[in-house]
Amino acid sequence: MYSSSNSFMGGANSARPGQPPFMQQPSYGQQTTQQQQQHQTGLAPQPNGYGSQLSGFGGSHLQPQPTGFSPGQLQSQMTGFPQLQQQPGFQTSAQPPQLTGYSIQSQAPQLQVPSSTGLPVRLAPQTSSEIADSFRGSAGAAPPPPPKTAGSKIPNIRLSFITAQDQAKFEQLFKSAVGDSQTMSGEKAKDLLLRSRLPGSDLSKIWVLSDTTKSGQLFFPEFALAMYLCNIRITGRGLPDALPEKIKNEVSSMVDIISFQVPDTQPEMAFPTNAPKFDAPLLENKSAPPAPQQPQPQQPTHSQLLTQLTAQPTGFHTQPTGIQSTQASFPGQSSSLVPQATAFPGQSQQQFLQTQPTGLMSNPQPTGYSGLRPPVPPMPTSLGPNLSPAQTGGVSGLVAQPTGVPGQWGFVNAPSSGLPNIEALKQQLMPQPGREGGFSAAGLSGNAHIPWAITKEEKKIYDDLFRAWDGFHKGFIGGDTAIEIMGQSGLDQKDLERIWTLADPHNRGRLNMDEFAVAMHLIYRKLNGYPVPNRLPPELVPPSTRNLNDSIGTIKSMLSQDAESRKASGAFLQPQKTGVSYLKDHSFRGGSGVSPGFGRKDATLFKNNDEAASGYRSSARRRVGNNGRTPSPATSQTSEEELSVGQLRKKIRETQIMLDAVDFQDENRAEEEDALDRRDRREVESLLDRIRRVQDDIDTHPDAAFRNLDNGAERRSLRRQLQSYEDQVPQVASDVRRVEREIAEAKLELFRLKDAKAHPNSASNIVGTGPGGAVTEADRIKARARARMQARAAELAGRPTPSSQEDDGAAARRVEAESAKVKADREKNDAMTRDVEDSVKDFARSLEDTLKDASENSTREHERRRWEDALGVEDVIRDFIYDLKRNSRTAYVRKEEASRSMHEEHERSRYDEAPATRPSPPPSTGSTGSLPGSTHEDRVAAARERAQKRIAERMAAAGLKPHNNTAETLLQRQEREKKEREDRLKQAEEEDTRREQERQRRLAEEQGGSMAQPAKPASKKPPPAPPSRRGRTDSAGQAEAKRAAEESAIVEQAAREQTIREEEEAQQERKRLEDDARKREEEFQREKEAQEARLRALQEQVQQGKIKKQEAKRRKEEADRLAKEQEAKLTVQRAELEMAKERERQLQLELEALDEESSSDEEGPENITPQHSTPGQSQILPEVDIAAPVAPSALVPPVPGPEPDRPTSATSSPTSDRTGLAHLPLETESKNPYFKKISLPAESQVATPQPISKAPVTSPKADVQSTNPFHRLAQQQENAKPAFTAAGPIERVSRARPEVDDDWSAAGSDFDSSDDDERPGGGSAKQLASILFGTMAPPRPLSAMDDKSPSKPSTPAPDTPVAASTAPEADGTLSIPSASIPPPPPPVVAQVPSIALSSGPPDAPPPPPPPPVPHMAPSAPPPGIPPPPAPPAAPAGAPNRSALLASIQAGKGLRKVQTNDRSLSSVAGRVLD
């Protein structure tokens, strides 16, 4: 019994790694010696037997068993065993445990049986078939082993991760490679896998994943998995780091099925499964101690087992006989007996057999002899505890058994270790309903093929599932919840009921974690094709239930047997001095490894032998070593008491040394970790520095602005654009179809028309009025009526009657044929349209997929958000990323500032180069380019900054102070203003110098031209001395002044308008951006100072430019005004002289020859030249210029001007002229300086010198008319009379005749003669005066004629009308302003020159000399000028000049004569009409 119980424990341990073989463990004799010392003398034969057992290994040891055990001893043993049987914790009989022991012993291949026993020596473990056959036939004839081919069968289980065809191919390949074997060796697998030509690293990983059992060989599912993984790698996919749970479960399940289906053909595979399946029936049989027959009952029937076991109790000799017969029937039974010795380490079979008689016979005695003599109980007491530990796990061996149970539940990967058998045996020994029933060998063998153990992975899965459903952590799951969970499996209700019954053996109506795992495992096995067992397999008994029951039963049995043995043997008198400790040493938690007195190992504590020499270990440190079971609170009181103080101190020192060593190791480990941490930190810092440097390089790169362009935004815009195009496709297709329909209808209509022409009488020409153009009956009736009328009309007209109408069928057929043709074309086009539409859709879909794949990559988006937006990273990394972003933004701002400063420098240089050509500084609006920002915020900030800068510039241009320019102090502002003034002065000086140089250049050109001018008309008639040098100079200056005035006016107006606009915009934008600027202050505080500096610089530039321009404008205006006033004075003075001289000349010419052409041959150029110019001064009569203003001033009062529209004549006072000069440029400004005064009334035009400065406009007309000098002379004579009244008409003439605008430049024309010299001032009043004075000079050949006419000015009545008439005729188109003037009497001679001046540059070709007098009369408004000026007498030499001066000085007399002349001239004018 002892060996039986311990064999279960030892058998379990023997199968575990790290446990010594049975033969190496301490002999059982030592333990039995201790036991014998405790027993009475009746037990002495037992030690003797043991001694013999220890002494040798012979069959004689079996004899000492009967010899050593007297009947009394047997009775005493039986006396103890009935107690064991009576205990509720041990309901099973003692004999089946012997068989149980045998079953476990059959697992130990190390044991040998001496030849004396008659048992053959078996190094390999027996299979269940062999053991069953040995039971069946005592003769020892073993049945023939099953065919090996049965093991090569592959279960018909479908693997889900490969196809059926692939699985069939893999099966064929596997069978061809392994033959009858169930596994493929590593070499064969290597040869096959190398054919895939995959790298060695991949094949190594595939092998690691495929070899799930880690056995170095592959089962078929593992081979199929390897081929599947090879296929994955060959197709380019990556290998997984771990197998998916589904594939792993399928492979492991199929491997279990294969490995347990063929235990007989491969003993090494069936070895782990034999024990548990054999244990189960033995436990159910409840046979207690006789362990030697444990492994056998898997195959034999229950009756055979009982028969063999009953032989033992019938008689002592029968028992050894039975044992021997059992050994005889078992070729390997000796090994099974030795496994009992496995419970007693190091014993051989003979020893173990002796041990069996020694202790087992006590066990057999209780089995067969219930109630023998009392001396035996000490033996059963000692054995009983040993048995109890074997059953309950109370001893260290039992500790291994409960350890095995958890191993099956999660600490063992497969049930092949034999532990399931031991635990099944222990569970069978526990009182459970239904365990007393017998089992057939078939049932036992069936159980042996099914592995019911729960692996660690499965247990973890079940526990997680339980925790998930146990939301309130109650520790159990109720029936309703379990029904809900288990109902999801899809099993039948009957199967679920059976599973529930098995999982809830106590009928509590709820399942704890272990029971729930059992239920789930049964469901899992049922789903995998396993039948639901009728009774719960021992491997599936929850450890909590089994351990609790075993513990309770063990304690009860130990207490009862100990008390009984002590009472019978008297050992209670010295419980600690007997050498055997029943309670302390037999700790069912295995806390102590040393027996109390003698230092010998108790049979129940053999498991701790290997660790006994390792020194002291506390219970806390031992806890994990005992496979999770909590050791006893104290290792052993006896051992503690027996340790001396020195030993304890030694142990303490050793422990202290160990602790110090551990602490030292911990410190070393901590130091190493610190060193590694420091190294890692250094590496991290170096990497961060590298990242920063790379980021800086990126930011400073010229193309850095393009790296952060939002490709996603562009891609989204492309997708939106693509979507818009896709939306247009249906509409386009609809339009195409509509057009196709229209085309088809048009074709049909065209065919009908053609058919109607070709067959006029056919019905095809009937126009249908029905829906869709269908021909109705009414249409046919109308067609027939129309045909009849056509026939009658033909008959009446005598025409041949039209041929008979064709039948409607022919026309319908033609129409139908054409319709079919058109329809076919239409369908063809529709098909093409559909194809195009489909292709467009496909193309759009491909484009959309491309854009979507590039943009909607979740991994890329996650990485971007993680490493760019710092989402989901540690704080250190997030701070680092933010720091990089700040540095990038700062680098971008610096780069933008640099580019902006460069741009501003460029603009400033441009501004300095041409400050006067720009009305306002444009850099303010575009000084900063739209450089793309690295981020959206940067772009927004840059836009705001540019807007703020524009606002500041506009405000500066408008004269407003920017609101944010608060950093400028008073001193800075003063310095800035001082600098601005200096710059303005400098610029003004530069402009004056440049203007003076230009003026000097023009003067030099005019002087050079005037020197060459007189030579041209010399061939015809020597013209008067050209006094045009000074006049031209004045004319050029006047033109320059005029241009400057116009330019200044334009600039001022543009500046004013732009200033107003900018001020308004600045005010609006300032209001809008004040809040934004206020918010940006904190963010851009660092950039603000530089920005304000730039703004101040720009503002200073703008203000300086404005001030410079304003100063220049004012200077130009002042200069122009002064020049105009002077010119006006000179104009008035010289105009009077010109009028007088011109009138005298005209009278002389009229007297000499009526033919104007002959008389104008010499004076034509002289008359034409001054038409557009007003001579400023005369070289001949400088004094006249000074005295001339006096006469006009005296003549001004009497000029009440009969024309209200012309209040002042050309001879109005210089004051009025000055006023007109000062105000006209502003009043009548225009883009075209030559058309400014067109809209002004004639009187303002006459009074202002503006028409004089604009005289060059009409110079081309004189040039055009200069082809005929006589006509020009006549025109000059006609126009010379109203010299002062044509200022307004000149403007209108120039506008009405713009064909010569190309020569209207007043800058540099030298119109000295009538030939080809055209100067802008040629027709001006100054030039005319110069010519007039020139004619007075002595060299003039016409001086004699001038001498004849000094007296004519007083009586020019007959001549004035003629002059007046000729002037208007030449000036016919220029007298528009005079049309509104009332017709007062024609002006006196003094008025004639003004007309000539004004109309000098007539655009109309020279008309015939006699112009209409009525037209002349309106143009006479200049009568305000006194007609009697004596200048007519001056044309002839010095006397004429003196007479002219005298007449000019006599202002009042002239005024008085003017009145008389006016009446005379009016009469003369009427006579001329």
UniProtKB/Swiss-Prot annotation:
Residues 289-298, 1402-1434 have a biased composition (Pro residues). Keywords: Actin-binding, Cell membrane, Coiled coil, Cytoplasm, Cytoskeleton, Endocytosis, Endosome, Membrane, Repeat. It is found in: Cell membrane; Endosome membrane; Cytoplasm, Cytoskeleton, Actin patch. One of its GO terms (biological process) is endocytosis. Residues 1152-1165 have a biased composition (Acidic residues). Gene3D superfamilies: EF-hand. It is a peripheral membrane protein. Residues 1-121, 134-153, 266-366, 609-645, 793-837, 891-1265, 1277-1473 are annotated as: Disordered. Residues 1440-1457 form the WH2 domain. Residues 678-759, 963-1163 form a coiled coil. SMART domains: EH. The keyword rRNA processing does not apply. GO terms for cellular component: actin cortical patch; endosome membrane; plasma membrane. This is Actin cytoskeleton-regulatory complex protein pan1. It comes from Aspergillus oryzae (strain ATCC 42149 / RIB 40) (Yellow koji mold). The lineage of its organism: Eukaryota, Fungi, Dikarya, Ascomycota, Pezizomycotina.
